[in-house]
UniProtKB/Swiss-Prot annotation:
This is UPF0237 protein MK1213. PANTHER family: UPF0237 PROTEIN MJ1558 (PTHR34875:SF6). InterPro entries: ACT-like_dom_sf (IPR045865), ACT_dom (IPR002912), UPF0237/GcvR_regulator (IPR050990), UPF0237_ACT (IPR022986). Belongs to the UPF0237 family. Residues 5-79 form the ACT domain. Pfam families: ACT_6. HAMAP family: UPF0237 (MF_01054).
């Protein structure tokens, strides 16, 4: 199974979750888990996404999510799950 971690950070505003999740849905990527919080006016979200049925590469998905993030005024980081875990190993 190919999975990615999608991290979204930026000023809180309506439509962020919808904008990011719609890009994932367009490419048959399945959101397995999601966590989000708002600290004052700062929005933060982490998604674990299954890409085994996706019709695009991780690189292309990253490009599209970053473009959507620019339109929404947020930063989007997309990493393979293994890379994410290696970077956050204690």
């Amino acid at each position: 199974m190919t999975r990615a971690v999608v991290t979204v950070i930026g000023a809180d505003r309506p439509g962020i979750v919808a904008g990011i999740s719609s890009v994932l849905a367009e490419h048959n990527a399945n959101i397995e888990d999601i966590s989000q919080t708002v600290l004052r006016d700062l929005f933060a979200m982490v998604m674990l996404v299954d890409l085994s049925e996706a019709d695009v590469s991780v690189g292309k998905l990253r490009e599209e999510l970053q473009k959507a993030g620019e339109e929404l005024g947020v930063d989007v980081i997309v990493q393979h799950e293994d890379v994410y875990r290696a970077m956050h190993r204690v």
